Amino acid sequence: MASETEPNSTLTAEKSVAASPRIVRLQGGGLRFLDAHEIPQLDFNVVTRPFQNNNTQHWRLTNVGGNVHTIQQVSNGRFLDAHEISSLHFRVVTRPKQNNDTQRWRLLDFGGGFFQIQQVSNGRFLEATLDGDFQVVTGPADNNQTIWRQGDP
C-alpha cells in the first residue's frame, strides 16, 4: 500500500530495506553504481562507476536494529564510512569494522527499490556527485543525488 506522505516528511514510515544480511548493488547518479578504490593511496574513497560485472560493486546490507544497517563491500570486507569534517569534504570511504555510528546507516525506503541512505552519526545523506571523479560524499537531503536504487547483484 502506497503512503500518502511526502518522502522527506518526518511522518515517513521508516521501513527496513533488508531484514537480514543481503548482497545488493546500489545505483545512484544515473547509470552508475556504488564502488570504492581498494588502495590506501586513494584513501579507499567511495565512487560511482559504470556497471562492472565484479564484486567491487556488491554490498552486504546487515540490519543492526530497526532500519539501521552496516554496508560492507563484498570484495574486501571493508565497511562504508565517511569523514565527518568539511576540510575532507565529507568524503565517503571504506574502513575496517569499527562498531560505531560512523559505520551505521539508516535506510529510508521510498518504495519501488528507491531509498535514501543516512549516516547515523551525523544525519548526513549518501550523495553521488556527478562531476570530477564521481566521488561519493555525505550531504543534506536537498537533491536527487541522495536517492539510491537497490538491485540484485
Q: In which residue ranges do the predicted regions lie?
A:
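Lectin-like carbohydrate-binding module/patch detector with strong preference for beta-trefoil
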Residues: 2-153
